[in-house]
Amino acid sequence: MTVSCPPPSTSEREEQARALCLRLLTARSRTRAELAGQLAKRGYPEDIGNRVLDRLAAVGLVDDTDFAEQWVQSRRANAAKSKRALAAELHAKGVDDDVITTVLGGIDAGAERGRAEKLVRARLRREVLIDDGTDEARVSRRLVAMLARRGYGQTLACEVVIAELAAERERRRV
């Protein structure tokens, strides 16, 4: 004869959900939406998830604004992503649009252009440019594609690549 165990009480389920969230937050900071998704995936009711997440937010363990600021700082430094790419990543992580706008508001267009120029310059140093310019179109396509993968707009990418290619040709000529 099989004896079925009663389901854990609400407070037990809440404690299990809290423990899961704390375990997930140990590895890296997460957004409220990411934690809610993990709780739902594991079968926790929405009301329990909301109570647990509200408690964690009250003590400062879940803060989407802080997460977004850290994410932007890290991704701009390590991956050289553009504002557009960062906004898409934050949106995919469930950060509110108002928070995204606020966090990305501190990045000006000049800084973004400067970062694109730095990326192109670094890549151009490793490129072999033939003096007759036959492979310049190939190099140009590669550089524009590199910037596009990082979320830079086509107009900005083309302008930066043309200017940096001209500067690199001049530098190598001297």
UniProtKB/Swiss-Prot annotation:
The gene is recX. This is Regulatory protein RecX. GO terms for biological process: regulation of DNA repair. Belongs to the RecX family. Binds to RecA inhibiting ATP hydrolysis and the generation of heteroduplex DNA. It might act as an anti-recombinase to quell inappropriate recombinational repair during normal DNA metabolism. It is essential for cell survival. It is found in: Cytoplasm. It comes from the Bacteria. GO terms for cellular component: cytoplasm; plasma membrane. Keywords: Cytoplasm. It comes from Mycobacterium tuberculosis (strain ATCC 25618 / H37Rv).
